[in-house]
Every structure is written in C-alpha cells, then in structure tokens.
C-alpha cells in the first residue's frame, strides 16, 4: 500500500487524488457520450459539472438532424453517424432518449461501452460486464416524501 500523507505535514493533494483514483478505478478523465439532446439532454450538456470530477461529455447524438453542430461546447452528431464518429476511448454513455432504446444500447455495447447512465424509463438488456445506473427523478421524489413523512411522525 502507498503512503499518501506524512505526519505533521499533510497530504500531497495530487498524489492523493491519483492514488485514490487508481484504488477506486476512477480515471477522472473519462470520455462520456450523451445520447439524446432534447430538453433533458440539453440540460445535462449545460450542467456538465462532472468534467471536474470524473471526465467530460465529448460528443452528443440525436435523431434530429437540426441539432447537429455544437451545443455548450460539445459536438452534436446525428445518431446515424454514431459508429463513424464514436470516440474510441469512450466507455460511458448517458441515455436521455425515449425511442429505440434497446437498439441504441446494442449499438453502444458493440462499440465497447461499459457503463450506462439511464434516464430512459425503459427496460433494456445489457451483456455481462456492462453496468447500468438508472436515474429516476420520480422515484427520488417518492423516497424523499416517505422520509419526510417518517420524520414528521417521530
């Protein structure tokens, strides 16, 4: 094991971040793609705060040809160009679409995607070794309401 700090002298912050990143498997420079640049996808692009913690969105894709170009400093391509424009070092995709979800996931897995952040509210299958993190705001609000009611009863 590595020694990250020295007694009475503190920590070398860069060394600590690099060491923790290695231990936790975080690259801190992940290339992320976004599928779906509608209202939610655009909000995600605009927010894009994870570029300071885990990486950044390097490309977005949408089925609307009118969205091709650049938004918030990120290149946006038509979904038909996914295979030809896919960043080769990308392992994470954010899904913010409502149609063709399984087909899109299948295409992403063929390209080597290993992690999916899912905003789709759709059920889809992934192969072994692909991790999915579902984000459901409705469920989060329901859980919050339950906790608040529980606190009120105490």
Describe the predicted segments one by one.
Residues 1-111, 127-154:
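Hydrophobic, well-ordered beta-alpha structural blocks that scaffold small-molecule cofactor pockets
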Residues 110-118:
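Internal alpha/beta core interface subdomains
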